[in-house]
Amino acid sequence: MSFLPLLSAFIPAIVLLGYIYWRDRKSPEPLKQLLKATALGVLAIPLTLAIVYPLQWIGVILEEYTTIFGAIYDAFMSAAIPEELSKLLLLWLFLRKNPYFDERMDGIVYAVCVSLGFAGLENILYVVLNEDWASIAISRAIFAVPGHFCYGVMMGYFYSLAKFEPLHRTRYSALALLVPVVAHGIYDSLLFIMQVYIPTWLESILLLCFLVFCFYLWKWASKSIKRHIG
């Protein structure tokens, strides 16, 4: 395994971990706790596969799709739902009796760590196993890994609200899964549809929609961080 592809796969997650740590600099979490949460996030990969493979075997998840509906269905069923469900389960296991989870921002920080643990390993698998690793590494550094960062912010934002606003715990607990699943599903749907045979003009529109969506995804995540810091 070449060192350069491996390094290029690692860097995006490390940079974003440093960014969320910096945003929480006024009341930072113990570094050991952050490393534990990130390491736990790596386990979301095998957990996701444990969900996906049986569903593929019984035919619930499509191995191939040739229609727009099939692309959207696959985006949610094979990626968005199992991945975000796995991350939320691991986040819950990590925080359910964690005394360091005592501020709203903490939920975002730990959820981002779990999400980037997942994204880091996923990125390594995509980059180092691809001959055209450089272009894959660049595109995923710009879109895929920051996307997982944003899903983590969404999950942690509502997870914290569920803890610190107990009167609305059920609603916020549901949103901690639903919101990142929808965001992740839309992101993947736009990409998956572009892999189906569609007219060039429609592909151009979808590409524009994808770029606009990514912009607003990051904007929403930034605002959510500010709300919980404030």
Regions found by a protein language model. Give the residues of each.
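Hydrophobic alpha-helical segments at protein termini of multi-pass membrane proteins
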Residues: 1-230
